UniProtKB/Swiss-Prot annotation:
It comes from the Bacteria. This is Proline--tRNA ligase. InterPro entries: aa-tRNA-synt_IIb, aa-tRNA-synth_II, aa-tRNA-synth_II/BPL/LPL, Anticodon-bd, Anticodon-bd_dom_sf, Pro-tRNA-ligase_IIa, Pro-tRNA-synth_IIa_bac-type, Pro-tRNA-Synthase_IIa_type1. Belongs to the class-II aminoacyl-tRNA synthetase family. ProS type 1 subfamily. It catalyses: tRNA(Pro) + L-proline + ATP = L-prolyl-tRNA(Pro) + AMP + diphosphate. It is an enzyme of class 6 (ligase). Consists of three domains: the N-terminal catalytic domain, the editing domain and the C-terminal anticodon-binding domain. The gene is proS.
Amino acid sequence: MRTSQYLLSTLKETPADAEVISHQLMLRAGMIRKLASGLYTWLPTGLRVLKKVENIVREEMNNAGAIEVSMPVVQPADLWQESGRWEQYGPELLRFVDRGERPFVLGPTHEEVITDLVRNELSSYKQLPLNFFQIQTKFRDEVRPRFGVMRSREFLMKDAYSFHTSQESLQETYDAMYAAYSRIFSRMGLDFRAVQADTGSIGGNASHEFQVLAQSGEDDIVFSDVSDYAANIELAEAIAPQTPRAAATQEMTLVDTPNAKTIAELVEQFNLPIEKTVKTLLVKAAKDSKSTLVALLVRGDHELNEVKAEKLPHVASPLTFATEEEIRAVINAGPGSLGPVNMPIPVIIDRTVAAMSDFAAGANIDGKHYFGINWDRDVATPVVADIRNVVAGDPSPDGQGTLLIKRGIEVGHIFQLGTKYSEALKASVQGEDGRNQILTMGCYGIGVTRVVAAAIEQNFDERGIVWPDAIAPFQVAILPMNMHKSFRVQELAEKLYSELRAQGIEVLMDDRKERPGVMFADMELIGIPHTIVIGDRNLDNDDIEYKYRRSGKKSLIKTGDIVDYLVKAIKG
């Protein structure tokens, strides 16, 4: 490809509305342009990267035995009503009616459509297992699209759905998809972790996320410094303290704390170690509970894990925090003065709180706290559960090493759905025993557009993108200096351009009438891995300057050797 026949569209300045580095660089490198909120046009450079990601995904899905299909983006509402998700999915589901007043949705996912297909096409256990995949546009009406294509409303996704007559068969395909995803992200040159995860709104049993490590990531991922253990922070178990609870050394005293409405204020004003404080959070109770609210207690320096809390049988789902008005109606005190002593509603404490002694907590009286509280002496030990987020340095749940926490960007997610959708849509086949058997399902997604952004978040420097070789828009950039004035520079550039293309190498030759500084800046911004610079001065010695984008290392290579050198560097 020649720049004179190409839409380069690079920008010198960073657009003001681009928050994260991937959004900034995708705009500056001429990869995307915003059409409307959460909607982007992919320009040639961006599309080349997107297609490379798509091709790797498709190859590995085919290698894993999945079968490609293509399903409509527009889906009839009755399928979503049949599955129960019409009411559950919320405003992210874009709903509309056609000219015949028939309701439809723009598909955010395709569980209903594929299950409908299978229930109409399959009839016998002999046809299973089958794993269908597509690479298709999705639409989710995000309340606040942000970070460019990282969280857009329209996006490209690879979604796969497998169907089985047994859990054992599902597990085999699940393991195959886990391995395929690991190969996909390894081939792309990404630093990633596969982590245990919550199943969320999709539902089902087992689940793993594939997270690309990046400082800008929205997810906290947890992994052992010794073993292979890794989990999303929502799911990571906080191990109970192994040391026995210390004996009480203080009497419980009621202390006036009129200006301490937060743990931070309490610690600062009374010079308390934060590890000796407890915070109390009130949430809505489950419908069958005798109380309207439940109190959840975590140590002052710990954070409540809302996913864990929501799974407690005493707690309403979805998790809903009580308003100050609701709290005062039950406790007669504000949120900053709550604690376990004389608490008139059910109390659940974290494992770490259960191991505390001589601690401070609200007295359930405005402007007052109890200091020196001890379990069983001052208040009976309530229900104990794991309800906090783990922190760095906690013991690993598998008993090997301690936990590290890093930020991650979710680029893939695999689920064991079980029979959630097949039961709702009555997808069944005749089993081996001749009886009707509801199918067991798996679901496997990769955010193809998100992978592009995540790769940039992990691969950039002050000059621009530093693409992993496998997904770079071009493999080689040829920069002929003053080619329009130097015949030998132009002649060699054309020769190398043809020879490299004949070797199957993707080349971008910058044949613009531009200053060298602009040419260098654009190629580094775009992130092409290999650059060769052809200039009269080096040609006097029969040399070409070669530069590897990732290391920045430059070297002089003889003109007769450069093609073989690049072929070896790229193809091995």
